[in-house]
């Protein structure tokens, strides 16, 4: 269907169509408002948009987000994770998964074939996304969607003087309140993969599967 204020065609069943004009050379104060970092920003001069018309389908759904909370972060992390996965795979083909659990942070799971691939994965992430500041790389036997397992790998498979890489004076996000006034930031990566090989770290201490099968929670719960 045709717009209300122009000849532009838009989907007839769109949830909502907002027709507006961007006013050239005009600025006004915007804010304060929250950001994905979890901090609130003050006022800033921003462009002005004048809304000319709003139309919507019957029973339209308008989706809003709670700024800096999970629904806000999820919108951006999905495409970021896909981009980082491609970047790591070009350097470490045996990458298993990538997760962005928090602002400026990335977890990577790899099946390490040769020494040094953990560090290669770190550099791939930091080089692929300006916003990335902290990278943790673990072996494929560690679930990167479980923060407790990631911290366990850091505690038991990482020696700080050997396995932490720090890059100074790199460009980062201006939304990071810890960034230096000149816009530079330090970035760091943690190689929490097993060294010299995963074989030296197995078997992991786990309750045998046959024991779990013999346990019936009904015997212990009222």
Task: Name every feature range the model reports, one short phrase each.
Residues 1-222:
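Charged, compositionally biased interaction regions
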């Amino acid at each position: 269907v045709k717009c209300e204020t122009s000849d532009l065609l838009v989907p007839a069943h769109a949830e909502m169509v907002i027709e507006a004009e961007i006013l050239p050379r005009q600025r006004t104060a915007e804010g304060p408002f929250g950001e994905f970092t979890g901090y609130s920003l003050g006022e800033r001069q921003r462009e002005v948009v004048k809304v000319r018309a709003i139309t919507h389908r019957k029973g339209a759904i308008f989706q809003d987000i709670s700024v800096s909370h999970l629904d806000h972060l999820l919108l951006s992390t999905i495409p970021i994770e896909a981009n980082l996965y491609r970047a790591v795979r070009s350097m470490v083909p045996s990458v298993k998964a990538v997760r962005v659990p928090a602002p400026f942070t990335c977890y990577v799971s790899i099946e390490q074939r040769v020494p040094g691939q953990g560090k290669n994965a770190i550099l791939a992430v930091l080089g692929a996304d300006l916003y990335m500041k902290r990278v943790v790389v673990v072996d494929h036997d560690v679930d990167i969607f479980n923060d407790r397992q990631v911290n366990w790998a850091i505690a038991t498979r990482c020696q700080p003087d050997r396995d932490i890489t720090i890059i100074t004076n790199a460009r980062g996000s201006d939304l990071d309140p810890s960034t230096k006034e000149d816009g530079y930031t330090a970035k760091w990566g943690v190689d929490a993969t097993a060294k010299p090989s995963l074989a030296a770290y197995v078997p992991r201490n786990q309750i045998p599967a046959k024991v779990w099968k013999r346990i019936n929670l009904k015997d212990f719960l009222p």
